[in-house]
Amino acid sequence: MSRLTCRRGGAVRAAWMILIGLSSVLPSSPRPATGADVAAGLRADVVATGIPRPIQLALDPLGGLVVLSPGWRGDAAAEVYRLDLRGPLPVDAARAPRVVIPFADESRKTVFGSLAVDPRSGDLFLGEENGNRIYRLGADQRLQAVAVGLNHLLGGSALALDHQGRLVFLDYASPETNLRSESPLPPSLSWLIEEGYQGPLVFRIDPREERRLPRRADLLSPILPRGAAPRPAREPQWRLISVTAAAGDDLVFLSSVGEVLRLGSDGELRLVARLPAGHYHRTNLAMGPDGSVFVSGGFHIRQIFRISPAGAVSTIASELGDPGGIVLDREGALYVAETALHRIIRIAPLR
């Protein structure tokens, strides 16, 4: 067990690398993912087991699968696994290395619920679920605050990296979310929130800029809404709960009511498709190479959808065990974290 030194907003935190013997991994082939119902022409195989409640997935620059987990005991902010899927499958993650990130030494014990990986540096970006901060875990094994002062950061793909390595993250402005912020306004100033803009907020920052970190979200100018925020003459927009980067500077979002929307370079938010009605919570998005969008509906929906570039919605998998994070590899295979079953499955065309 080797210690990793990590920093959190100036305070030193400790993370632990748990190294468990990698021997005794028996050669095997991927086995069919029982219980998962996939569309015709596809198959689902189990590629990793023994991961306690995997909630987020990403690929590192070498093609390894990065998995975010809360751990078995719930006594840490997160556990991070890095799995090499080029060998015998399924991988027994109980025998794989993992990084354990402990809670901060303060009263709040917030877990990490969102993950993005810089495809160039391999740095991990970790967001607090139902929290206010985003961190970067770099190759130097230090945990550094990147953004603070959010009102309410959700889990799932509430943050993402675009094609230029800029960090995009979602927030929401309302009297209720202000109460969850790190520095809520006192009751005497609550009218500033009630009479101001209420609705989704989208921010984009470049962590590599020569500017001091962390950035304060409450002092940043959002890219949505852009310019002067609209006055509350109508009902606030639905909350944006997931984001992924599309071609160019475009971004694709999922709203809390199942709307798939696209934000173009002109600043206009356009409806792409509507998913079936349901409770969308801890959802995740992934962009296909042809411009299609994959949506993991979360543990209430238990389905994965594909939205074609033309906006047609199809279901590619259902009856999943609490689907969480999703990611596409270079060959177009879709990896899915089945949180309730403590495993990762791969959905790919039949061969």
Which residues does each predicted region cover?
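Blade-level signature of beta-propeller repeat domains, shared across WD40, Kelch, NHL, RCC1
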Residues: 323-351
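A short loop-to-beta-strand structural motif that recurs across blades of beta-propeller domains
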Residues: 77-82, 133-136, 200-203, 259-261, ...
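Beta-rich, blade/repeat-based domains predominating
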Residues: 50-62, 105-121, 150-166, 171-173, ...
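Surface-exposed loop and turn segments in beta-propeller and other repeat-based domains
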Residues: 42, 93-107, 148-151, 210-234, ...
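Conserved beta-strand positions in repeat-built beta-propeller and related beta-rich domains
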Residues: 50, 67-76, 118, 125-130, ...
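A short helix->beta-strand "capping" segment at the edge of beta-propeller domains
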Residues: 33-51
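Short loop/turn segments that connect beta-strands within beta-propeller blades
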Residues: 84-89, 137-142, 206-210, 263-268, ...
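Generic structural signal for coil-to-beta-strand starts
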Residues: 64, 122-123, 142, 166, ...
